[in-house]
């Protein structure tokens, strides 16, 4: 599911809200989550999972085409850890 599909589905399930209203709400939620991650925080959605930022150190990489060694700079990447309820629902039939 992509963001536009989520917005359309939420608007259909909540006829008292327009699609524009749902779009604004989803946009604000995502912006707040991104803002929290930018500030070095963590976003936890109980039962679903937690988003945080992890640091990747600088390292030596290799260009697969030429074999040349290149320096890869240190960077921050988003990290998702699934919640217990989500894992349980995904593995319910096993």
Swiss-Prot record:
InterPro entries (alphabetical): Hist_DNA-bd, Histone-like_DNA-bd_CS, IHF-like_DNA-bd_dom_sf, IHF_beta
N-terminal signal peptide: none
A GO CC annotation given for this chain: chromosome
Subunit composition and interactions: Heterodimer of an alpha and a beta chain.
The protein's name: Integration host factor subunit beta
Function: This protein is one of the two subunits of integration host factor, a specific DNA-binding protein that functions in genetic recombination as well as in transcriptional and translational control.
Annotated GO MF terms: DNA binding; structural constituent of chromatin
A biological-process GO annotation: DNA recombination
Native source species: Caulobacter sp. (strain K31)
Keywords noted in UniProt: DNA recombination, DNA-binding, Transcription, Transcription regulation, Translation regulation
SUPFAM superfamilies linked: IHF-like DNA-binding proteins
PROSITE patterns with a match to the protein in the record: HISTONE_LIKE (PS00045)
Keyword Transcription in record: yes
Family note: Belongs to the bacterial histone-like protein family.
UniProt cross-references to NCBIfam families, sorted A to Z: hip, PRK00199.1
């Amino acid at each position: 599911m992509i963001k536009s599909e989520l917005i359309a589905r939420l608007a259909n399930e909540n006829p008292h809200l327009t699609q524009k209203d749902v779009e604004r709400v989803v946009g604000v939620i995502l912006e707040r989550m991104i803002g929290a991650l930018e500030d070095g925080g963590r976003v936890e959605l109980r039962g679903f999972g937690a988003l945080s930022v992890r640091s990747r150190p600088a390292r030596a990489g290799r260009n697969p085409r030429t074999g040349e060694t290149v320096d890869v700079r240190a960077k921050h990447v988003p990290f998702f850890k699934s919640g217990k309820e989500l894992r349980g629902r995904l593995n319910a039939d096993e």
